């Protein structure tokens, strides 16, 4: 059998099957029944809406337009106190972040009830020489961005933070964002070095959102 004949047979089989696949209800009435009850046909509809959970911290896709996508960019926030500032207890603002100045866009969009948010670090930030700075020395301050209420930020810890629970309204839909501003509290004099970094020396924090 050549390819052309095979394709014709396949097309014919599909054509024969189409009425079966696309069949719908039909009803015939004759005589007086054409006036009452008349001919009726029914169609059933189903709309399948997937659960959606979107989390953004830093660089990411737009989320106010409905075009939610994934973006693998990981931002780096850097704190650089001067020698005179080290350990003086005055908080040091960061550099970097998608909003600059150590400020990140944070957003949650969901459609199926309450959302639980937390942050996990492997341990204290290290310098590779045995010295550490605890994540409790990095403070996150949440302020409003576009939503009426700012998205709360988990308090960073040398491990998994306490949960932040976002309570969904009756619609079960959450759209909440904030500007998260990071600061190094600078409460102690520590040995010189680069603590943490881009996914090295426990420098990475993983934020996780979950939804039932």
State where each predicted segment sits:
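N-terminal small/polar-rich segments of proteins
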Residues: 24-145, 151, 162-212
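N-terminal signal peptide c-region/cleavage motif recognized by signal peptidases
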Residues: 19-23
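Extracellular glycan-recognition regions
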Residues: 150-156
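Bacterial N-terminal signal peptides that target proteins for export
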Residues: 1-10
